Amino acid sequence: MKSIIITGGAGFIGSHVVRLFVNKYPDYRIINVDKLTYAGNLANLKDIEEKSNYRFVKADICDFDAMYALMQEEQVTGIIHLAAESHVDRSIKDPFTFARTNVMGTLSLLQAAKLYWEALPEKYEGKRFYHISTDEVYGALEMTHPEGIEPPFSTQASSEHHEAYGEDFFVETTKYNPHSPYSASKASSDHFVRAFHDTYGM
């Protein structure tokens, strides 16, 4: 049985992801790791808490030892990382907490996964680390289409009518342009994930 850790699984988006995986993949063991801060609510998952392939672990992703031990215990093959401080206004009042959770928490998970997976005979083969980011890392879009004309709703349409509509979509080549402590912390975590891929092959 494959085991997948989903961090932040008691949050709004995370709980939907956890429920989807628990119900869609009964042969997978789904481990929901959440610190249960103001954004987490286990009531979101009442309908699946008794499922045999589901486990909840209350833990802080910044706790490297706990994350490493959990990966060893569950023989984790995949991580879907949604846990994050995500309230822009809160980040302005308390940027340190956002840097700790979003940057150091992500780094803690990456390092734990790296050390666990690279010690296996097959190393990273068949292992995946999925990092969920935010469009906030790109800053704000400037709507440059003529007043009264709605922008297209596909990147193909945007490309075909670029002169009329301008840059109405974030695309793969959009440059990072974070402005708040929240978006800066998420941009930093994005770069760490890419660095671990490029440096270690994760």
How would you name each of these model-derived features?
Residues M1-M202:
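N-terminal Rossmann-like NAD(P)+-binding domain of SDR-like oxidoreductases, especially those catalyzing
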